[in-house]
């Protein structure tokens, strides 16, 4: 198995432990794509230069932490838009 497949599978497993919804992780053209679908919400993020970043120490735990932070901000902004004016 190649490193990108192992990394994306491990990240998927860790994200599923923390997040409700459908989680999709994939490496394509040296870019790690992450998508989370829940109800009618769709969150996407990506990491460019995947191979170089892994060589310099990018770990699934670090990406997990960053994705959770971004996803939390995304959800908070959605709630604000739905419940508050302006």
List each model region and its residues.
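Intrinsically disordered, low-complexity regulatory segments enriched in Ser/Thr/Pro
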Residues: 35-66
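N-terminal cationic leader/targeting segments used for protein routing and processing
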Residues: 14-17, 23, 50, 78, ...
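Mixed-charge, Lys/Arg-enriched low-complexity segments
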Residues: 57-86
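Negatively charged, low-complexity tracts enriched in Asp/Glu with abundant Ser/Thr
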Residues: 1-27, 58-69
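Coiled-coil-like amphipathic alpha-helices with heptad-repeat character
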Residues: 13, 30, 48, 73-75
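Short edge beta-strands and adjacent turn/loop segments
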Residues: 25-34, 39
């Amino acid at each position: 198995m190649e490193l990108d497949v192992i990394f994306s599978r491990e990240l998927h497993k860790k994200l599923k432990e923390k997040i409700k919804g459908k989680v999709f992780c994939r490496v394509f053209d040296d870019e790690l794509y992450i998508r989370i679908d829940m109800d009618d919400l769709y969150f996407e993020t990506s990491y460019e230069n995947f191979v170089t970043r892994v060589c310099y120490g990018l770990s699934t735990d670090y990406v997990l932490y960053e994705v959770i932070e971004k996803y939390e901000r995304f959800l908070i902004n959605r709630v604000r838009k739905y419940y508050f004016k302006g």
